[in-house]
């Protein structure tokens, strides 16, 4: 059988990224889906969109980590590996930004869901009542399935990776996987779009890899470090106000607690298969 685990982090790097045109936040090809939290189900994700990264020790047990090939969007998975997908706040059921403008040096949000026009703020944060968070208050507490956007959108046992999952993937660098060429954690390009990111490859089967675009993150209405830094949610709470997340930049990466619950970050779904 399979067991559910979760986690979160980020790494601050300032910078700009040269891109052009108007874009929707979601580049996706799947319809909105939801379903019961059923173990041993692939949900709505096709086999071609799943990547077997090998077996890892997660909290003392061995699991095969099956990652989605692309980032999560409001309606499923992004079309291309280099697509940013959508930016989710922790425990939120949907992204608040629905479109952004790409300029020569930045991304600028241009559309929001109803009630979230102020952006990724504390006041808008899921389960914040104006004075405190009313749900999830304990260190290392995990998101429940009903608050996991990856599970709710993809179904099956898909989930946001836990802190333990991300940490296992980081610790495996130059052992069972490589982060960037030769494990040096250098950013690279995966296609002609010119969007940089981190390529994490299985050492035993280099054709099995995931590419994490350097999405940056969004705080309030400002995108930060786009093209220089990747910030991906975990399902694990660090403090009542902060979460664990995985972050990377040119030559560095790890799991950190500097990500606030209301920050908008990318999600790379995973499912765990017990060995």
Where are these regions (language model features)?
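Bacterial N-terminal signal peptides that target proteins for export
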Residues: 1-12
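Structural boundary micro-motifs
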Residues: 2, 32-63
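C-terminal motif of bacterial Sec signal peptides marking the signal peptidase cleavage site
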Residues: 20-24
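C-terminal, surface-exposed recognition/capping segments
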Residues: 27-41, 55, 69-79, 83-94, ...
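A short glycine-rich, aromatic-capped structural motif
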Residues: 49-133
């Amino acid at each position: 059988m399979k067991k559910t685990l979760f986690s979160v982090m980020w790494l601050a790097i300032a910078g700009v990224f040269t891109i052009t045109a108007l874009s929707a936040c979601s580049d996706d090809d799947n319809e909105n889906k939801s379903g019961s939290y059923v173990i041993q189900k692939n949900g709505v994700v096709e086999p071609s969109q799943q990547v077997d990264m090998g077996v890892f020790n997660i909290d003392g047990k061995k699991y095969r980590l099956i990652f989605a090939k692309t980032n999560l969007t409001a309606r499923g998975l992004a079309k291309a590996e280099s697509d940013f997908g959508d930016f989710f706040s922790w425990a939120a059921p949907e992204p608040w930004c629905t479109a952004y403008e790409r300029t020569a040096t930045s991304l600028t949000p241009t559309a929001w869901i109803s009630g979230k026009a102020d952006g990724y703020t504390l006041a808008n944060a899921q389960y914040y009542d104006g004075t405190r968070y009313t749900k999830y208050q304990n260190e290392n507490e995990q998101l429940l399935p009903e608050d996991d956007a990856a599970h709710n959108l993809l179904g099956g046992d898909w989930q946001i990776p836990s802190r333990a999952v991300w940490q296992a993937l980081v610790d495996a660098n130059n052992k069972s996987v490589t982060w960037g060429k030769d494990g040096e954690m250098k950013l690279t390009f995966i296609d002609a779009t010119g969007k940089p990111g981190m390529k994490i490859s299985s050492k035993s089967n280099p054709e099995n890899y995931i590419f994490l675009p350097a999405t940056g993150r969004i705080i309030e209405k400002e995108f930060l470090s786009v093209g220089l830094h990747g910030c991906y949610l975990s399902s694990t709470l660090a403090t009542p106000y902060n979460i664990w997340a995985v972050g990377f930049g040119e030559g560095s990466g790890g799991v950190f607690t500097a990500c606030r619950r209301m920050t908008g970050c990318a999600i790379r779904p995973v499912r765990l298969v017990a060995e």
